[in-house]
């Protein structure tokens, strides 16, 4: 069965989708079979792997709310070994519609169980909130990867996320683990970035990935071309660091 990893942080702009897309693509590049699950109604992970939102007939909404078979909604991408379970703005109504549904917190888990044997890794790109969609992701996951931006107030709000993780561990998924904390958007020219690294490592200790994602122009350009960085510019610093991260994730087992 696939290892299922949620990429979560309720703060926006910390590199969740960038990490979901590029970590998935780099693992696929290394020969791993990967499914990227987009449960953010903005659908940026979907477009980030080249899927046009206007071309999507069915999406993760139909799986969660309408009980459509997961396999029928999965799309191949232009990268070998990388598939996507796409999202559209239709998903924004799912949390309200699921409130009265029986076993509402395990809808995604049941959906992914249908296809788990086809993949080595499944990554879930979570929305910037701690609502029912993120709860579904954590319930379906073996672990959670937490991106933290190397900026002032980096740790703000993390206690809320960690409390949600503990509640899910207690009531819904006792095996949920912290995969690791990923430092993102580092500007090595500033003292602040170094201070944040020290602060995060002091708090999370060995749970912090060795790989740190720097600010990188090519990494920022890639989504507008609908390509992961490993396809857009394989020689860029952004591609190098996400390949390093992919190797760390494989080594974690």
Swiss-Prot record:
<dbReference type="InterPro" id="IPR027417">
    <property type="entry name" value="P-loop_NTPase"/>
</dbReference>
<keyword id="KW-0378">Hydrolase</keyword>
<feature type="binding site">
    <location>
        <position position="214"/>
    </location>
    <ligand>
        <name>ATP</name>
    </ligand>
</feature>
<feature type="binding site">
    <location>
        <position position="17"/>
    </location>
    <ligand>
        <name>ATP</name>
    </ligand>
</feature>
<feature type="binding site">
    <location>
        <position position="14"/>
    </location>
    <ligand>
        <name>ATP</name>
    </ligand>
</feature>
<feature type="binding site">
    <location>
        <position position="11"/>
    </location>
    <ligand>
        <name>ATP</name>
    </ligand>
</feature>
<dbReference type="InterPro" id="IPR025669">
    <property type="entry name" value="AAA_dom"/>
</dbReference>
<feature type="binding site">
    <location>
        <position position="17"/>
    </location>
    <ligand>
        <name>Mg(2+)</name>
    </ligand>
</feature>
<dbReference type="Pfam" id="PF13614">
    <property type="entry name" value="AAA_31"/>
</dbReference>
<feature type="binding site">
    <location>
        <position position="18"/>
    </location>
    <ligand>
        <name>ATP</name>
    </ligand>
</feature>
<feature type="binding site">
    <location>
        <position position="16"/>
    </location>
    <ligand>
        <name>ATP</name>
    </ligand>
</feature>
<dbReference type="GO" id="GO:0030435">
    <property type="term" value="P:sporulation resulting in formation of a cellular spore"/>
</dbReference>
<comment type="function">
    <text>Inhibits the initiation of sporulation, Spo0J antagonizes this inhibition. Soj ultimately inhibits the activation (phosphorylation) of Spo0A. It is not required for chromosome partitioning. ATPase probably involved in chromosome partitioning. Cooperatively binds dsDNA, forming nucleoprotein filaments in a strictly ATP-dependent fashion.</text>
</comment>
<keyword id="KW-0460">Magnesium</keyword>
<feature type="binding site">
    <location>
        <position position="216"/>
    </location>
    <ligand>
        <name>ATP</name>
    </ligand>
</feature>
<keyword id="KW-0238">DNA-binding</keyword>
<keyword id="KW-0067">ATP-binding</keyword>
<protein>
    <recommendedName>
        <fullName>Sporulation initiation inhibitor protein Soj</fullName>
        <ecNumber>3.6.4.-</ecNumber>
    </recommendedName>
</protein>
<keyword id="KW-0479">Metal-binding</keyword>
<keyword id="KW-0547">Nucleotide-binding</keyword>
<dbReference type="GO" id="GO:0005524">
    <property type="term" value="F:ATP binding"/>
</dbReference>
<keyword id="KW-0749">Sporulation</keyword>
<dbReference type="GO" id="GO:0016887">
    <property type="term" value="F:ATP hydrolysis activity"/>
</dbReference>
<feature type="binding site">
    <location>
        <position position="12"/>
    </location>
    <ligand>
        <name>ATP</name>
    </ligand>
</feature>
<feature type="binding site">
    <location>
        <position position="15"/>
    </location>
    <ligand>
        <name>ATP</name>
    </ligand>
</feature>
<comment type="similarity">
    <text>Belongs to the ParA family.</text>
</comment>
<feature type="binding site">
    <location>
        <position position="13"/>
    </location>
    <ligand>
        <name>ATP</name>
    </ligand>
</feature>
<comment type="subunit">
    <text>Dimerizes in the presence of ATP but not ADP; ATP-binding is required for double-stranded (ds)DNA-binding. Interacts with DnaA.</text>
</comment>
<dbReference type="InterPro" id="IPR050678">
    <property type="entry name" value="DNA_Partitioning_ATPase"/>
</dbReference>
């Amino acid at each position: 069965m696939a290892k299922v990893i949620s990429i979560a942080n309720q703060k926006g702009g910390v590199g969740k989708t960038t990490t979901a897309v590029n970590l998935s693509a780099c693992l696929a590049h290394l020969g791993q079979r990967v499914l990227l699950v987009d449960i953010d109604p903005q659908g940026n992970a979907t477009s980030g792997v080249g899927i046009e939102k206007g071309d999507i007939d069915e999406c993760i909404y139909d799986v969660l709310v309408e009980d459509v078979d997961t396999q029928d909604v999965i799309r191949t991408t232009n990268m070998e070994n990388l598939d996507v379970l796409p999202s559209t703005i239709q998903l924004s109504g799912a949390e309200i519609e699921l409130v009265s549904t029986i076993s509402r917190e395990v809808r995604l888990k049941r959906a992914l169980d249908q296809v788990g044997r086809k993949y080595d890794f499944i990554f879930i790109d979570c929305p910037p909130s701690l609502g029912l969609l993120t709860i579904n992701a954590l319930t379906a996951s073996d672990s959670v990867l937490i991106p933290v931006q190397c900026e002032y107030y980096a740790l703000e709000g993390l206690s809320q996320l960690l409390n949600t993780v503990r509640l899910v561990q207690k009531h819904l998924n006792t095996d949920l683990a912290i995969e690791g904390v990923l430092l993102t958007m580092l500007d090595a020219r500033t003292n602040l970035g170094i201070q944040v690294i020290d602060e995060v490592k002091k708090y999370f200790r060995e749970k912090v990935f060795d790989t740190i994602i720097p600010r990188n122009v090519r990494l920022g350009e890639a989504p507008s071309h609908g390509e992961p960085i490993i396809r857009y510019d394989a020689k860029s610093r952004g591609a190098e660091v996400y390949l390093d991260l992919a190797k760390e994730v494989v080594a974690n087992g």
